[in-house]
Amino acid sequence: MADIPCLVTTEMNNMLQMVYTREEVDRAVFQMEALKAPGPDGLLLLFFQHYWKIIGDEVSVAILNCLNLGSFPQSSNNTFITLIPKVKSPSLVSKFRPISLCNTFYKIVSKVVANRLKGILPNLISESQSAFQTDKAISDNILVAFETLHHMKNQKLKKKGFPGFKA
């Protein structure tokens, strides 16, 4: 472990450990998509955004208690896992993909934490990595590998040899 450099500076660590604020909760609520599928609570984020002036104080207190004190209501962690079709009129299980439908409270907590992490992630994750970065997906690497193999196969058929790779 001594040979692995520490990438999280004292300043980053202090920023991550700061007490979460009402402003962070407000920002998260209004950054999120209002019409995403609801979880077991049955509530769309649209409800929270529309009635935030009425319910914002109480919801924020609950979220801040969770984030700052670690008191996370058990029911907030309930999630539905369901299958959604990948194609029109699927006939095989493989033509579905699973998604998790989380409670809105859980989604807001996650967004507040994600916003806090966004400030330091570029310092911790290489730009060449395709996961955990905005506008990138881990599946991008699969496409690059497929295209590389396809190109190599075509080169082999033309008897031009293979490119060299360095690992």
Stretches with model-predicted labels:
Residues 94-125, 143-149:
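Conserved pre-motif C helix in the palm subdomain of viral-like polymerases
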Residues 36-43, 92-101, 142-167:
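Conserved catalytic palm subdomain of right-hand nucleotidyl-transferase polymerases, strongest
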Residues 43-51, 129-136, 165-167:
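Conserved short loop/turn motifs at secondary-structure junctions
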Residues 34-39, 64, 68-71, 118, ...:
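Short amphipathic alpha-helices and their capping/turn residues within compact interaction modules
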Residues 73-75, 138-141:
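A short catalytic or substrate-binding loop motif that flags glycine-/basic-rich loops and adjacent residues
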Residues 84-86, 104, 135:
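Structured beta-strand/turn binding interfaces of compact recognition modules in eukaryotic regulators
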Residues 1-94, 108:
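Surface-exposed loop/turn segments and immediately adjacent short secondary-structure elements
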Residues 76, 127, 159-162:
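Short secondary-structure junction motifs
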